[in-house]
């Protein structure tokens, strides 16, 4: 399931992070840090999506919910349970933020703050 996610949402998030680093003329270490950040962020996003599909409402999420379980699809919630999926998403968010290293709010100002906030948003979103 982790590999499948990496080919979908994860690839889009990694591309966005790495292309931004390239356009910003970041060095190899910064590009690697952003790529690793995006890998963790993409997986946390997918887990949050699985959680929303499990416990969200159509009004809140804006799309049909419960369809993965109805289709018998393997999700992070079905594999880890709801609490386990939440714990894994939180751990990935923390890991993503840790991977930023020199991109932290104190070191890189607004850019670092935005990336840290983005990681938090991914696991607290309700749609």
What are these regions (language model features)?
Residues 1-127:
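All-alpha prenyltransferase/terpene-synthase fold signal
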């Amino acid at each position: 399931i982790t590999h499948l996610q990496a080919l979908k949402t994860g690839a889009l998030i990694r591309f966005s992070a790495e292309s931004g680093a390239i356009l910003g003329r970041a060095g190899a270490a910064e590009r690697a840090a952003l790529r690793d950040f995006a890998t963790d962020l993409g997986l946390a996003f997918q887990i949050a999506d699985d959680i929303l599909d499990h416990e969200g409402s159509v009004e809140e999420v804006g799309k049909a919910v419960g369809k993965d379980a109805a289709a018998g699809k393997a999700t992070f919630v079905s594999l880890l349970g709801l609490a386990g999926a939440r714990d894994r998403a939180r751990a990935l968010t923390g890991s993503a933020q840790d991977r930023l290293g020199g991109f932290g709010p104190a070191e890189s100002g607004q850019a670092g703050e935005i990336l840290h906030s983005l990681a938090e948003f991914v696991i607290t979103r309700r749609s």
